[in-house]
């Protein structure tokens, strides 16, 4: 392996030669596993990239776009990961910022209007990249525009592709149709089998339908182990409890026939894991035990009832957070605060840390994030948040704030 730095006008690039493989033009130096992944993906028109979060999948795909010479690229991702792509493209390539279109930030009408302005690719034309989220890529009026010949989409990248694992979802079906006409297709995810082996079907229906076919029932018959007797009694398929799946070696062999998987070569600092138990005060513990025992609570401000096991889990979590959603007789709901013990503990814990130490705190409920914000204000340090209501991550990354509160659902994927 050797690298040679060359100049292209005022810009500096690297030409990387991998033995007998093609020379890759790279703007930024790749890690070893990124080079191997690029070498694997480069000759393939349909392939999957399975590496862990933080391993640089986005850079690999940007380098692939540049070196394959794609002209019209559609990147589909969840909305939060969509925000990562444009800064990464500017960092790892010389593609002009004006050629990167963040469609996820536009209405459906404006998406369609923008795409309709594109004419067929001309000789010498640069690359245009369209970044769109899964929730809107298939919706009208933009859905038909992706198929226009004059738009000429020649590559589709599904980032966090486990989002299309449901064979019946409208987004998954739409991308399967689009995959039939687009010559180059790629999957990116760290969890291709997020819940069970059946998750692979819809992803590969988009990627390469020749691998598992397009008949989901036949796919299930081949890889699911159904309890025939129990299924006959209830009238619908029930999987065998002891061995719900079969032929998994065959499934994995086909799955990795066009997929690259490799552990990251990046050596991160060792982490220290500590479990700190925060005892509940007696008044909170009493409420928790009564709720667990009776499945209901009655207070002066209102009452609370639990109808199922999932609801019970959520209500218990709310109690430990120090809040209770109580319903009044008139049907209105009040979120009653029963304790601030966790806020007090968090303040004492953060007080022990160096003032320059950046902190990330994950939480589930909006009231938890509110408590974290109040602790930050009490400490006199800045606060940023990644949630369904707010995204001020840039302030934390730039050092303007010290504490970052992250809601689990909003910060679960591709936060750079």
Regions found by a protein language model. Name each.
Residues 53-54, 182-197:
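Conserved helicase ATPase motor motifs in RecA-like P-loop NTPase domains
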Residues 159-160:
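Walker B catalytic acidic pair
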